[in-house]
Curated annotation (Swiss-Prot):
Residues 1-20 form the signal peptide. GO terms for molecular function: toxin activity. Residues 21-44 form a propeptide. Disulfide bonds join C47-C62, C54-C71, C61-C89, C73-C87. Keywords: Disulfide bond, Knottin, Secreted, Signal, Toxin. GO terms for cellular component: extracellular region. The keyword Signal applies. It comes from Lycosa singoriensis. This is U1-lycotoxin-Ls1kk. It is found in: Secreted. The presence of a 'disulfide through disulfide knot' structurally defines this protein as a knottin.
Length: 110
């Protein structure tokens, strides 16, 4: 009887130790995931939104629903006759077509 009792105490101790190790692993995974989300949020705050000027930072556009916006540039003639380049973050035509097809597919199939 004493052997069964000691064996039971040993199993309970072993189980509590292993579950504590698993909880520590889960806590570490949660912390890593939280840090990753915070870093992504910071990067999202630094990006340039759609339809805003990206002339000086052509690779800093934000992400859209499916794709990252692209910096699209045009040449503008000012009132004084000078040609200058103006850029804005927008969705390229082939990305618009892909988003349209995906949206249409979602309406039909899902």
């Amino acid at each position: 009887m004493k052997f069964v009792l000691l064996f039971g105490v040993f199993l309970v101790t072993l189980f509590s130790y292993s579950s504590a190790e698993m909880l520590d692993d889960f806590d570490q995974a949660d912390e890593d995931e939280l840090l990753s989300l915070i870093e992504k949020e910071e990067a999202r705050k630094d990006c340039i939104p759609k339809h805003h000027e990206c002339t000086n930072n052509k690779h800093g556009c934000c992400r859209g629903h499916l794709f990252k916006y692209k910096c699209q540039c045009t040449t503008v003639v000012t009132q004084s006759g000078e040609e200058t380049e103006r850029c804005f973050c927008g969705t390229p035509p082939h990305h618009k077509a892909a988003e349209l097809v995906v949206g249409f597919g979602k309406k039909i199939f899902g």
